Amino acid sequence: MIIFKSINKLNKEVNFKADIGFVPTMGALHQGHVSLIKKSQKKCKKTLVSIFVNPAQFNNKEDYKKYPKNIQKDLKLLKNLKVDYVLIPTVKDVYGNKSKKKFKISKSNKILCAKYRPGHFEGVLGVIDQFIKQLEINKIFLGEKDYQQYILIRDFLKKNSNVKTILCKTIRMKNGLAYSSRNKLLNQKSIKGSAWLVSKLKKLFIQLKKDLNNKFIINDFINKNKVFKIEYLELRNKNNLSKKISKKNVKIFIAFYVKGIRLIDNF
């Protein structure tokens, strides 16, 4: 495993003509990241993992400061997985001396997380733009848990590059809660409670697929679980996130707070 702290040095030493899969992360690695890496290793000759906590995608400075970091633990995990290349760039290395460019997203995309986290996805697309401009990657691997992010990056890359986007399924703990770096900020009681809510969400989705227009049970679910402060609970088309849904294309999306920590999920 070769570790690079400079994009320039990485480009000088790595032959990007080879089939290279890219797994962008913000560190605090977990089993969800492991699944992305293994998928890349299966599909590509070489795998590059980045660890970069992108300040441009945080609309809350405290959220940025609190984001869990353990670089040595992350590197140990990546070494055990036999990752080929790891990139740990600085903010200046990624963005240069320019201001962190933020892309505008359309009004139709300002839904779900984009509605409640202004500037977040603009920051995400900004850093992805920098990576694809500076790294000649072939494929990028993204997790299903961050589904809205996947859709936006997929559409952005289709318009602006030849990079192929690979969606990887959500990996869950034994209790059903999706692995997330933010889980590390929760105590066991909060994790158990979150897992309980997600299990109820899964059952709700089964009910809703029988009657997609039943708004009553959605409102009832929110009202009965006010302790979690549900930010949104919506049904969307999995192909484009529109509200034109059918039993074949529907997904359910949720964002909620537990002890001040924001979690998202979907089925």
Predicted segments, located by residue:
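Nucleotidyltransferase catalytic core that binds NTPs
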Residues: M1-V227, R236, N240, G260, ...
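A C-terminal functional module that forms or caps the active site or interfaces directly
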Residues: Y232-F267
